[in-house]
Amino acid sequence: MKNQILLLRIAGYISLLFVVFHLFFYPMFNWENALNGLSSMNRAIFLTYHAICILMLLFMGIIPIFQTKSLLGSSLKYGILSLFLLFYLIRIVAEFTLFGISSSSPAILIMCLVPMIFYSIPLFSKQTIK
């Protein structure tokens, strides 16, 4: 049980690191100019989805860090942790299918694989918290 709490909190902190990283995307990728090639509608959709992604990552960090025992003790853990797991699984698949293999791929793979595994362990554990 203590291991599950530790794993979820580590995964939560990694998710919060992704929040910080994503907050720098706008200047890092020069989106002010780079997104000018998109129609105003596609630009708005892109930026909206990015904001939602940041919010989702924030949720994926805060809940496991501050509500770990509540999460593990609830039947909602199956839905919530499955969603977290799928989020990172989709990101891993996207790394190779949409972005292509690059020099940063191993780092992204590891940074996504660790929380994906850590979020999945409580799903398959028989331990329960009351």
What are these regions (language model features)?
Residues M1-F18:
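Cytosolic juxtamembrane helix and N-cap/initiation of the first transmembrane helix
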Residues M1-Q4, T68-S75, I101-S102, T128-K130:
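Membrane-interface helix-boundary motifs at transmembrane edges
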Residues Y13, L17-Y26, M41-K69, S82-Y88:
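Core segments of alpha-helical transmembrane spans in multipass integral membrane proteins
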Residues P27-E32, L58-S70, I92-L98, P122:
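Membrane-helix exit/interface motif
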Residues N36-I45, G73-L76, G100-C112:
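Non-cytosolic membrane-interface motifs at loop->transmembrane helix junctions
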Residues S74-F84:
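Short, amphipathic, aromatic/basic-enriched membrane-interface segments that mark the entry/exit
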Residues L85-I108, S125:
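Membrane-helix boundary connector in multi-pass membrane proteins
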Residues V114-K130:
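Membrane-water interface at the C-terminal end of transmembrane alpha helices
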